[in-house]
Structures are given as C-alpha cells and as structure tokens.
Amino acid sequence: MFTEQVLNVIILLQTATVTATAIPASGCNAGDVQCCKSVQKADSAGGAALLGLVGIVLSNLDVFIGGDCSPITAIGVGGTSCSSQAVCCENNSFNGLIALGCVPINLSL
C-alpha cells in the first residue's frame, strides 16, 4: 500500500512539473534553448532541491528552473530533438546543472 502511494506521488510530480504554455523556439529571446531532464517551479520540493545543489537563494520563487540541461544548437534543422523538456532559459551559468528563468518551448513550431 505504501509503495503504491509513493508511486502515485512520483507519477503526479512528473506529470505536474511543467504547467506553463509552450512557446515556439523562434520566440526564445530571453536566453539559449536548452534540453532539460527536469523542469520545475522554484518553490516546489524538487525545485528547492535543485537550487540547494548549487546554494542559490532566489527572491522570486515564481519561476521555472531546469535541471541537467544541455544546449540545443540547430533549431529548424532536421534531427534537432530533445527527449526531455525543451526550454528557453535566462540564466544558464551553472554548467548545465541547473538553468534559471525557464519557459517551455515547442521545437516543432
């Protein structure tokens, strides 16, 4: 029973981590396009854990942060893909560990 509850919570967290509306990749004027394995609100438990990894304290917790991100460089070229969540992030200065101020994007638009 406990295992089933834990599994349900994990599934809920995975499906609820990104709720922002995706924008086309061409509309990414805030920063670089990234492919992140996780994208969460900064005020969530997962977001707090990511921020704690690098000792960041944010004054605005109403932003999305990406975890384990890598740049996507050739938008519009065949073969561009992201098997996780494609995002446009304002601050990617943490060597891919986390990215701040992320907005989900749609690579197919």
Swiss-Prot record:
Give the principal location in a single coarse category. secreted
Residues modified by carbohydrate are 91, 106
Cystine pairs annotated here are 28-88, 35-82, 36-69, 89-102
Position of the signal peptide: 1-20
Question: InterPro entries attached here?
Answer: Hydrophobin
Keywords for this protein: Cell wall, Disulfide bond, Glycoprotein, Secreted, Signal
One GO MF term: structural constituent of cell wall
Q: Which Pfam families match?
A: Hydrophobin (PF01185)
Q: Which SMART domains match?
A: HYDRO
Top-level taxonomic group: Eukaryota
Disulfide bond listed as a keyword: yes
- According to its UniProt record, where is this protein located? Secreted; Secreted, Cell wall
One GO cellular component this record assigns the protein to is:
extracellular region
Instruction: Give a yes or no for keyword Disulfide bond in this entry.
Output: yes
Subunit-level organization: Self-assembles to form functional amyloid fibrils called rodlets. Self-assembly into fibrillar rodlets occurs spontaneously at hydrophobic:hydrophilic interfaces and the rodlets further associate laterally to form amphipathic monolayers.
Q: Which family does it belong to?
A: Belongs to the fungal hydrophobin family.
Q: What does this protein do?
A: Aerial growth, conidiation, and dispersal of filamentous fungi in the environment rely upon a capability of their secreting small amphipathic proteins called hydrophobins (HPBs) with low sequence identity. Class I can self-assemble into an outermost layer of rodlet bundles on aerial cell surfaces, conferring cellular hydrophobicity that supports fungal growth, development and dispersal; whereas Class II form highly ordered films at water-air interfaces through intermolecular interactions but contribute nothing to the rodlet structure.
Name of the protein described by the UniProt record: Class I hydrophobin 18
